[in-house]
């Protein structure tokens, strides 16, 4: 499998990216190098190798959930530079 400049242009469009011709060429080369490396992994002989599902025998090693005091809404908002009712007000980021 290989990536073409057309593929890179399509992926860039989906990601809302713009590449110059040189960047598009570089991205095509780099993606093809990655795919070539992944193809090399397919050549590794894994016969007789058990699949690894975990590196240790412990199961569900999680802390116990417990309630802890937290800030109430007013306390959290008291130093906010701008707020609207019970919410932080921030500048628009996405146009």
Swiss-Prot record:
Reactions that this protein is recorded to catalyse: L-glutamyl-tRNA(Gln) + L-glutamine + ATP + H2O = L-glutaminyl-tRNA(Gln) + L-glutamate + ADP + phosphate + H(+); L-aspartyl-tRNA(Asn) + L-glutamine + ATP + H2O = L-asparaginyl-tRNA(Asn) + L-glutamate + ADP + phosphate + 2 H(+)
One of the GO BP terms on file: glutaminyl-tRNAGln biosynthesis via transamidation
EC number(s) stated in the UniProt entry for this protein: 6.3.5.-
GO molecular function: asparaginyl-tRNA synthase (glutamine-hydrolyzing) activity; ATP binding; glutaminyl-tRNA synthase (glutamine-hydrolyzing) activity
Class of enzymatic activity (EC top level): ligase
Source superkingdom: Bacteria
NCBIfam families attached to this UniProt entry: gatC
Protein's job: Allows the formation of correctly charged Asn-tRNA(Asn) or Gln-tRNA(Gln) through the transamidation of misacylated Asp-tRNA(Asn) or Glu-tRNA(Gln) in organisms which lack either or both of asparaginyl-tRNA or glutaminyl-tRNA synthetases. The reaction takes place in the presence of glutamine and ATP through an activated phospho-Asp-tRNA(Asn) or phospho-Glu-tRNA(Gln).
Protein name: Aspartyl/glutamyl-tRNA(Asn/Gln) amidotransferase subunit C
Source organism of the structure: Prosthecochloris aestuarii (strain DSM 271 / SK 413)
Gene: gatC
């Amino acid at each position: 499998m290989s990536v073409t400049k057309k593929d890179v242009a399509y992926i860039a469009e989906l990601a809302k990216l713009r590449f110059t011709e040189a960047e598009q060429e570089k991205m095509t080369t780099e993606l093809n190098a990655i795919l070539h490396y992944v193809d090399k992994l397919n050549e590794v002989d894994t016969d007789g190798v058990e699949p690894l599902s975990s590196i240790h025998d412990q199961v569900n090693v999680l802390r116990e959930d417990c309630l802890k005091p937290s800030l109430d809404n007013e306390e959290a908002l008291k130093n906010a530079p701008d707020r609207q009712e019970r919410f932080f007000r921030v500048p628009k980021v996405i146009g």
